[in-house]
UniProtKB/Swiss-Prot annotation:
Keyword Cytoplasm set for record: yes
GO-annotated biological processes: endoplasmic reticulum to Golgi vesicle-mediated transport; intracellular protein transport
Upper lineage: Eukaryota, Viridiplantae, Streptophyta, Embryophyta, Tracheophyta
Protein name: Coatomer subunit alpha-1
Organism: Arabidopsis thaliana
Pfam families the UniProt entry points to: B-prop_COPA_B_2nd, COPI_C, TPR_COPA_B, WD40
Primary site of residence: cytoplasm
Protein's UniProt keywords contain Repeat: yes
Role, per record: The coatomer is a cytosolic protein complex that binds to dilysine motifs and reversibly associates with Golgi non-clathrin-coated vesicles, which further mediate biosynthetic protein transport from the ER, via the Golgi up to the trans Golgi network. Coatomer complex is required for budding from Golgi membranes, and is essential for the retrograde Golgi-to-ER transport of dilysine-tagged proteins.
The entry's keywords: Cytoplasm, Cytoplasmic vesicle, ER-Golgi transport, Golgi apparatus, Membrane, Protein transport, Repeat, Transport, WD repeat
Domain of life: Eukaryota
InterPro entries membership: Beta-prop_COPA/B_2nd, Coatomer_alpha_WD-assoc_reg, Coatomer_asu, Coatomer_asu_C, Coatomer_complex_subunit, G-protein_beta_WD-40_rep, Haem_d1_sf, TPR_COPA_B
Amino acid sequence: MLTKFETKSNRVKGLSFHPKRPWILASLHSGVIQLWDYRMGTLIDRFDEHEGPVRGVHFHNSQPLFVSGGDDYKIKVWNYKNHRCLFTLLGHLDYIRTVQFHHEYPWIVSASDDQTIRIWNWQSRTCVSVLTGHNHYVMCASFHPKEDLVVSASLDQTVRVWDIGALRKKTVSPADDIMRLTQMNSDLFGGVDAIVKYVLEGHDRGVNWAAFHPTLPLIVSGADDRQVKLWRMNETKAWEVDTLRGHMNNVSSVMFHAKQDIIVSNSEDKSIRVWDATKRTGLQTFRREHDRFWILAVHPEMNLLAAGHDSGMIVFKLERERPAFALSGDSLFYAKDRFLRYYEYSTQRDSQVIPIRRPGTPSLNQSPRTLSYSPTENAVLICSDLDGGSYELYIIPKDSVGRSDVVQDAKRGTGGSAVFIARNRFAVLEKSTSQVLVKNLKNEVVKKSPLPIPTDAIFYAGTGNLLCRSEDKVVIFDLQQRLVLGELQTPFVRYVVWSSDMESVALLSKHTIIIASKKLVLQCTLHETIRVKSGAWDDNGVFIYTTLNHIKYCLPNGDSGIIRTLDVPIYITKVSGNTIFCLDRDGKNKAITINATEYIFKLSLLRKRYDHVMSMIKNSQLCGQAMIAYLQQKGFPEVALHFVEDERIRFNLALESGNISVAVASATQINEKDHWYRLGVEALRQGNSGIVEFAYQQTKNFERLSFLYLITGNLDKLSKLMKIAEVKNNVMGQFHNALYLGDVKERVKILENAGHLPLAYITASVHGLNDIAERLATELGDNVPSLPEGKTPSLLMPPTPIMCGGDWPLLRVMKGIFEGGLESADRGGTVDEEDVEGDWGEELDINVDGMENRDIEDILAAAEAGEEENDEEGGWGLEDLVLPPELDTPKASANARSSVFVTPPQGMPVSQSWSQKSSLAAEQAAAGSFDTAMRLLHRQLGIKNFTPLKSMFLDLFNGSHSYLRAFSSCPVVPLAIERGWSESSSPNVRSPPALVYDFSQLDEKLKSGYKATTTGKFTEALRLFLSILHTIPLVVVETRREVDEVKELIVIVKEYVLGLQMELKRREMKDDPVRQQELAAYFTHCNLQTPHLRLALLSAMGVCYKAKNLATASNFARRLLETSPVDSQAKMARQVVQAAERNMTDETKLNYDFRNPFVVCGSTYVPIYRGQKDVSCPYCTARFVPNQEGNICTVCDLAVIGADASGLLCSPSQVR
């Protein structure tokens, strides 16, 4: 059994597959109907209008409807698109067992405990026929898939087949009056719309289920006598064919498989049994430990079954549908049915080669799993799971292609896997001894070789090499030298796909794709939410793969995207250009044409083939917000500008790429204050004073404008601004501008007009304006302020700018490949100076006669004018020199030695050497490459919030450098401090940088944290544990054992941080006793040291006991007693248990179930029970509810929840 989907719920009593979509309906004993997407594993909807258990449910074949019947005697018809019940059919007088739509007519058949079967017309919403005859509960009833028959099973120990041909004729409009009269009579006097055709007797006890065969005249039934019976019928009679025995309890449901000649039954003996319908023998049995099975459903089109049991349901397949295939150049060998087939890609010719299995061999779950081909010897190895793993070796005759009558005896053997490793050698895995047998084509053992790891499968990895798979890693093993060539930690690998040049390999797990080099050096990891099915490399080195419902691509750097969606899963065999060749589940070859433009464009960007990028921009229809976001994310905003029409997005991209001209054009179109402000900030950063001035004018930001005029020495406009402030009656602005201008008289005048006569007098006196000072003194009279004597006053004048006007000089760089396209696409980016002046003057009542440096039009035109100088020397600014003719230039002799001193070239700084050689974040930070360190931590651990690490980065950098002071006129000499330095060290070999953090420090902090926890200093303990979590990414250890210890420390500290956060939260919530109890309860489920767990249990027991939740307190008390507490604690716990046994109740209901295993969400502090979806922090592994995905982890305060990360890298031994 291959379980595809499983749910946990109340007992499932009814199941129905949707005929087209990957949906299944499950009706529960609790009265809820669940609609699941079994492919994605998600609950789509739930319907809960029934009162009591719902035992029957069924999808309509073509309409968006389903029907349900329950113990409330009601049949409800639902529209799942509108999420509501359309109507209810009433008529049954007891529990309804099953309901089913007719495949063609608007009928529903229902079986009930009122001993009747009813047929309803769901369009007219009436009962059209009542089938009576059973004298006990009718357990099931169903329509025949093609004929006018109904089969029913009852506890009266019979199976009945009913003929409803008359009902069909009655439903079809009568052709003449005689027929109409007959129908009227039957309506008046009780007609015979349905008659019993056969009564099948043979079961000794009540029959629970009966079902028709989809195509043959067969019926299968299951009963409380633990037997499954097979019946055959013809036009006149029906008889028992055989009885299938094996179930140990009541058979609850039995079905024919839709595609295979088998019968599937389930029973209250907790088993599902699979029977051969032809031989009537048991093939397989699947058991559950605690759950009885109640219902089966078979998908009408696909190889899927579903079974409902006491605690949920499972969707499963009986055998794999992936065809075994092997690629060889332009051809494909694959196994289908009983033949090995050959497919040629160039001609798309498909032919049979040889039979590979004798007819009549049981084929269930024994189809070929893998296929390996040797082109030189024309030999094929086919592996299957038969007998615990076996292989068959066939030598294909050269003239057998196209013929299928060449029968040969295959050479067989047992082994977990078998693959060709050389021209005439193949390797077979012996799982029991974990060794490989190398055999020749005569199936003789040539060599035995033990494997370096416990291996459960082997794959081809080049001539003489094997890729060995264990549960958590893969290794490449050289059989000749018996050496491990590469090793990589991976999830459980299912398939291995090598590129055509054998330089790259894709390792496919259930939900992960790992791209690595031929030596298993990790290149990128990709995670998928739904199952990965297959993959192949295209000609450009892009990995194309399929999931259950998509064809996707993966670039060499790990970027991925969707190429197209799929209706059914496919298995890619080859990618050639824009064509994907694949096999479907029926073993048919298909060629699918795809649009590869998107990933080729991204690949060209990645490989910096900008000529291709430019060509694709001009010729392709690349568009969409996703492409713009990708280009922006990858640092190509200037490319993204080509795809954007929206002015706001263009403005943002232009600012990001520093393209001021496009930004001005977009800001003019948008004309909003915020955009002008941001434009001013960017223009100021670039030193473009003209644009800065223009932006400040548009936002009427006079303070910034006056300061700009001050620092650029534009005193004329500064004086105009002062007049504007005077007109606007802005005293402070007027005074500021006067101060900037150094205009003392104006300042005295402003102070006098503002009524500050003492200040005006002091200003005039200090600056030597005696006439004005005397006049003001007269006005002040006796209130003249006294000035200090003996001080020599100096005039406060603003400094004169050294460089007045002009933009900052910018380095001239080569014109970017993408700039030409932008300039040619003129978007009206120039701003008319007359318009600017008009707005400026109208608003400020003053005429500004142009900008000093250059107007906007000149600015935008200058760049184009400068770039049009395309003569060879124009860009260099070289001039022709007129030299006097009498000065001959002397020629230097060949052996003349120059007396000019040549400075030796500067060597590489040590920090740069460290940065280039290391891939550890701590060493990058010590070298001063903070940006690289942050990128590494983001890629390895998903860290995004680097604020807690800032001080540590600086400590690492300072700790690895020392500075020697020389003469006062000389700069200090920096010295690099290396790790493990000694006097015998070679001066030319650089060791890694010395690090201020090591693992022993963390051990000391951990002990301090334990001590603080024990003494109840939770805030201090939390600080210490968080400090450990923040330090671990920047610690370097030497051995693999120490790496494991570091990873173990992360888990330990994470548990304490989460627990302490909950405890501190609990202490804050004094007004919410229920939440206090919940948080105390969750704290006890953190993985703590025994003394701390004991204290947490004691605390939770006390809180719950005080709240009179005695049952919950009793649970904590029992757990406390299991930890061997001290006498006083044990005595208290026993007293709580005794008190609870007298009254085992809880006064308040808590969101806490100690019987159901759970983890606690690190953000919301609610339990996530086993089976519920969650997301985790890639660094500290704390678990969260799904809606927290994308937020910063609240436990470690570093990583992004749910982010993809390759894992902690803290040792050079992990890199080797």
